[in-house]
Regions:
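Electrostatic cytochrome c docking/interface patches
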Residues: 26-58
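Soluble non-cytosolic domains of exported or imported proteins
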Residues: 44, 56, 94-95, 124-128
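Gly/Gly-Pro-rich "capping" loops immediately C-terminal to redox-active cysteine motifs
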Residues: 63-105, 118-121
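C-terminal capping alpha-helices of c-type cytochrome domains
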Residues: 98, 102-111, 120-140
Length: 140
């Protein structure tokens, strides 16, 4: 019962923060498209590198299953999927960075029936990409 209350409170906080106008750490216009990521990913900070790993179809491809709250959405960029939960208020949902990293590394550890691939365990993406994705997730 306590876990349910905690989940409800965290979800409520996420809705309130989203409604209050809290946005991602990166400001409007700063989110590169997949094509632009090829240029900025090498020199960008970890948050931009995480965004690029998350949207790149040959890397994390997180947005195939998840929607993300970024403002503004890159022009001409397809909206995210609806298979997984939306990527919103991630710092509230995962106050411990290691827990979020473990979820990205192998979501089957906490939910054997998840459709999320174990990116780290199966070496689908690099450890650096996982760290960068976690940094990006904690910024939104």
């Amino acid at each position: 019962m306590l876990k349910l209350k905690t989940a409800v409170v965290a979800f409520g906080a996420a809705i309130v923060l989203a409604a209050a106008g809290y946005g991602p750490a990166v400001q409007a216009g700063d989110w590169p498209t997949e094509k632009q990521c090829k240029k900025v990913a090498k020199d960008g900070d970890t948050i931009i590198k995480g965004w690029c790993a998350a949207i790149t179809r040959k890397a994390g491809n997180c947005l195939a299953c998840h929607q993300a709250m970024v403002n503004p959405w890159p022009e001409g960029f397809p909206v995210g999927g609806n298979i997984g939960p939306p990527l919103v208020a991630m710092a509230a949902r995962f106050p411990n960075r290691d827990d979020l990293r473990a979820q990205v590394w192998d979501a089957t550890a906490t939910n054997p029936n998840t459709s999320m691939p174990p990116f780290g365990r199966h070496k689908l993406i690099s450890e650096e990409d996982i760290d960068n994705i976690v940094d990006w997730l904690l910024s939104i």
